[in-house]
Amino acid sequence: MTQATNQTPGQDVPGAADVPAAAEGQGQGQGERRGGGGGRGGDRRGRGDRRGRGRDERDSEWQERVIQIRRVSKTVKGGKKMSFRAIVVVGNEKGQVGVGVGKAGDVIGAVKKGVADGKKHLVKVPLTRSNSIPTISTGRDGAASVLMRPAAPGTGVIAGGSIRTVLELAGIKNVLAKRLGSKTPLNNARAAMVALRDLRTHQDTAKERGITLEQIYS
């Protein structure tokens, strides 16, 4: 018995040998599209790496010094809850400095919180060419007060305790500072921050008075 086939005259029917070639071509096209997506993903990863390096470079500019770590307690209904308090000074030695306080159940957590708090309370310090302060300044916090005077190149940082730490991380190389009143490290550090915050350059003074720099120096 002869089977009839519905074949249009002049139309070629693809053979079995031609089918794998077409499937292979489709596979190559899909592979190329997948490869293109992988390339774009690689570019995104590259941009992420660059952003990560930028954050690391910014973080590396900051220096941290712990002034004091104390074990403190809080009386609650169930008794006393013990924790640690860390006083940290953060600065980039380029005219920016901050003092922060952190409390946590462990020392590392308290220091991390202190660093974050210090970066939230940064003060910009106007520095002279000799890395000193432009004018005399005083600061007060609680019972502690600090007096700062400009110094000539080569003098160094004449200060002690937490005040010295604040001045060094601010980038000041030549200054005379005197502590008056309380010896508490936190109050002294905050008094030093107030003195640095209230600093005014000669340009600021001339602008406030409405005169020129020549009139100030004369």
UniProtKB/Swiss-Prot annotation:
A GO cellular component annotation in the UniProt record: small ribosomal subunit
Nucleotide-binding recorded as keyword: no
Gene3D superfamilies referenced in this protein's UniProt entry, alphabetically: 3.30.160.20, 3.30.230.10
PROSITE patterns linked: RIBOSOMAL_S5 (PS00585), S5_DSRBD (PS50881)
Signal sequence segment: none
Domain notes for this protein: The N-terminal domain interacts with the head of the 30S subunit; the C-terminal domain interacts with the body and contacts protein S4. The interaction surface between S4 and S5 is involved in control of translational fidelity.
Protein name according to UniProt: Small ribosomal subunit protein uS5
Organism: Synechococcus sp. (strain RCC307)
Taxonomic placement: Bacteria, Bacillati, Cyanobacteriota, Cyanophyceae, Synechococcales
Gene name per UniProt: rpsE
